[in-house]
Swiss-Prot record:
Chain segments annotated as transmembrane: none
Organism of this sequence: Dictyoglomus thermophilum (strain ATCC 35947 / DSM 3960 / H-6-12)
Record's catalysed reaction(s): 1-(5-phospho-beta-D-ribosyl)-5-[(5-phospho-beta-D-ribosylamino)methylideneamino]imidazole-4-carboxamide = 5-[(5-phospho-1-deoxy-D-ribulos-1-ylimino)methylamino]-1-(5-phospho-beta-D-ribosyl)imidazole-4-carboxamide
PANTHER family given in the database record: 1-(5-PHOSPHORIBOSYL)-5-[(5-PHOSPHORIBOSYLAMINO)METHYLIDENEAMINO] IMIDAZOLE-4-CARBOXAMIDE ISOMERASE
Gene Ontology CC: cytoplasm
One term of GO molecular function: 1-(5-phosphoribosyl)-5-[(5-phosphoribosylamino)methylideneamino]imidazole-4-carboxamide isomerase activity
Active site positions: 8, 129
Name under which the protein is recorded: 1-(5-phosphoribosyl)-5-[(5-phosphoribosylamino)methylideneamino] imidazole-4-carboxamide isomerase
Record-listed E.C. numbers: 5.3.1.16
Gene designation per UniProt: hisA
Enzyme category, top tier: isomerase
Taxonomy of the source species: Bacteria, Pseudomonadati, Dictyoglomota, Dictyoglomia, Dictyoglomales
Domain of life (superkingdom): Bacteria
Keyword Amino-acid biosynthesis: yes
Amino acid sequence: MLIIPAIDIYKHKVVRMETGKKEKIVLEFNNPLDLAKYWEEKGAKALHLIDLQSAIDANDESKSIVRDIVRSVSIPVEVGGGYRSREKIEEAISWGVWRVIVSSILGMELDYLLDLFSKYENKIIPSIDWYDGKVGIKGWQDFIEWRDIKRKIDLLKVREVIFTDISRDGTLKGVNLENIKNFLSLHDYDVWIAGGISSIEDVIKIKDLSENTGRIKGIIIGRALLEGKINWEEAKKIIDAS
């Protein structure tokens, strides 16, 4: 398992939004690049970088910041937020990203997806942004049925997805373990867990679930790390332990 710090960017700033709503910005500060370098110095093995302005407002104003972070750190960076076209995905890949996180394009025609994933299968990872059994797209402003997404993922032969619990994302309410278990029961993919992880106890719960299932690749944490609710060194030690 890995523990990956999350950096959300909106209008050139690092932010945290409750349940992905821009009306609910609960944390905001400058210098996203400084934060990325900080996590690299602290021993993070990868970064999870989301352009919320692109995801929510379809505005690429912050794209240059995302690009500069990818090029300025030596650890792998996965990027997401508004990657809804082949051109934009290919542009991010040209920066040297670890992988591009996609969700909205999963609603597109299967032939288009088959062509895209066949060319970039190791550079694209679907994000299943989960709310009440449906999958959020377009900055979590629209929702589509899970069964439709699963059918396409199965045909694309994807083996890893990110699971984000929208109802807990950015809330510090703690992880909903039953939601995660339920999601794992619906498929056989390996999963990266995000949304609501807010304490060392949450980290331990997911680590235990990983050991029981063998299918959790890692956890993605944002607000709890930024606010000191989770101690980075302690969490990393737990995750790194065999």
